């Protein structure tokens, strides 16, 4: 992907991404051989353009555009921004299913939309590729009972003929994926839904020794089984899964560092079980700091910088793309905590 982005003589960027000519058949995040299925349960043949891959391609172009601009490559930056805008328009045209009010899982080799309801769409919240007018429908669908188990969002809807609560990618719940979706919910301003998913993950962690989440768990709901069930070969500890809870914590506290400017944006959203949280040894650039976040008797959240060993400005601001956050709320967020 990096080679596509940074070839000085390349005249145009690819649009919808499918797959590399080498490697596994399924080259989205769900890379097992049976992970991408049509509505009737048949496996989709390669090449496949999964929805989440387009979102990460979109985000990569935007971030590389910023880098190009900073490095003085202004023409290249504008090309990347234009390509990102075009990709977002094409994605929302080709992947949106107006009947289901949801995005499809993928485009098959004939560019037909695979209208299977999966967790993959949640990644598109995090990357920002979803059109604003579709956000509420997408969030409601992700948290519907056939996808949201009560422990997390399933990889596949329970309504699908291929659903198996103990499969690797066809019904299980992945904590690392749910952390990504949690980040996307908060990024887009869905605070109540962010808390709902985060608290489900906390309850899930309590089932395991040392609150260590396994690689993946089953898709059983609490009213079906007292636990979500265990995927037979789930690893614990597991590398990428170890990032799940740190990302959830970052999401709930709204931490967004701008290290080069010695700035840390915060916007704490505390669950009912968290009256206060302290972070110690937080690095932002060359500065190490400690912060306290708490909720007062009126259910308002506050932040205090406890200590720092270098320059750092802590500023409260909601996520830049949050739906429904107007100028008034952003200005009020700048007022000091009492």
Could you say what each language-model-derived stretch is?
Residues 1-8, 56, 63-66, 79-97, ...:
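Alpha-helical scaffold segments in carbohydrate-active enzymes
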Residues 9-50, 89-173, 206-230, 247, ...:
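Extended glycan-interaction surfaces of carbohydrate-active proteins
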Residues 45-59, 76-79, 83, 116, ...:
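Short, contiguous, pocket-lining structural segments
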Residues 157, 216-219, 223-228, 261-279:
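Acidic, turn-prone loop/beta-hairpin segments
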């Amino acid at each position: 992907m990096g080679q596509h982005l940074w070839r000085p003589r390349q005249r145009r960027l690819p649009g919808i991404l499918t797959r590399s000519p080498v490697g596994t058949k399924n080259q989205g995040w769900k890379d097992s051989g049976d992970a991408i299925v049509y509505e009737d349960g048949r496996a989709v043949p390669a090449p496949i353009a999964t929805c989440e891959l387009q979102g990460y391609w979109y985000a990569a172009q935007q971030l590389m555009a910023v880098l190009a601009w900073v490095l003085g490559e202004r023409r290249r930056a504008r090309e990347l921004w234009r390509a990102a805008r075009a990709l977002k328009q094409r994605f929302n045209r080709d992947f949106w299913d107006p009947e289901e009010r949801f995005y499809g899982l993928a485009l098959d080799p004939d560019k037909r939309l695979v209208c299977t309801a999966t967790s993959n769409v949640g990644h598109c919240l995090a990357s920002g590729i979803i059109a604003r007018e579709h956000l509420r429908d997408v969030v409601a669908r992700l948290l519907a009972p056939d996808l949201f188990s009560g422990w997390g969002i399933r990889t596949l809807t329970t309504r699908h003929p291929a659903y198996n609560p103990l499969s690797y990618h066809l019904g299980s719940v992945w904590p690392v994926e749910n952390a990504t979706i949690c980040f996307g919910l908060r990024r887009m301003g869905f605070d109540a839904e962010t808390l709902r998913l985060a608290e489900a993950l906390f309850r899930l962690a309590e089932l395991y020794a040392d609150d260590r989440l396994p690689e993946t768990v089953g898709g059983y709901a609490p009213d079906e089984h007292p636990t979500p069930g265990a995927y037979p070969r789930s690893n614990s500890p597991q590398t990428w899964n170890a990032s799940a809870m740190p990302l959830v914590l970052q999401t709930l506290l709204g931490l967004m560092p701008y290290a080069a400017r010695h700035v840390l944006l915060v916007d704490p959203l505390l669950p009912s079980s968290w009256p206060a949280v302290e972070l110690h040894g937080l690095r932002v650039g060359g500065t190490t700091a400690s912060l306290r976040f708490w909720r007062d008797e009126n259910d308002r959240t506050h932040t205090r910088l406890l200590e720092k060993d270098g320059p750092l400005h802590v500023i409260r601001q909601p996520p830049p793309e949050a739906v429904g956050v107007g100028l008034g709320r952003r200005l009020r967020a700048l007022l000091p905590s009492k």
